Curated annotation (Swiss-Prot):
The keyword Electron transport applies. InterPro entries: MvhD/FlpD (IPR003813). The F420-non-reducing hydrogenase vhu is composed of four subunits; VhuA, VhuD, VhuG and VhuU. Binds 1 [2Fe-2S] cluster. Belongs to the MvhD/VhuD family. This is F420-non-reducing hydrogenase vhu iron-sulfur subunit D.
Amino acid sequence: MAEPVIMAFVCYQUGYGAADLAGTSRMQYPASVRAIRVPCTGKFDITYALRAFQKGADAVFVAGUKPNECAFETGNFKAEERVKFGKQILDELGIGGERLEMFFMSGADAGKFTEAVKEMTDRVKKLGPNPIKA
């Protein structure tokens, strides 16, 4: 299997900071992750994940602020609920809900970001490629 393609929707306040710090600190993680910055994970919509799977992503994760640390107060909790709902949709579509995950981190959690990428990469390697990948 080729290296899995992982899409990460990252909060501008926290997830993006963690991803940026991981890069500037030269931390090692699979290069197959593609990070898309969103103003807040509360802006994340399940259609973003569905489109990513349609375009060939093997997994998608959302990296938001830690609980009670969201700059927009409840954005991370809204994203968490959408991810839970998205998992159900992915199971019903036969793609698999385990291909979608939510992680909470601060902007200083570079290690948490790299762990999330590694966890999702390992998960996809066990599951195999996206079943709807063209």
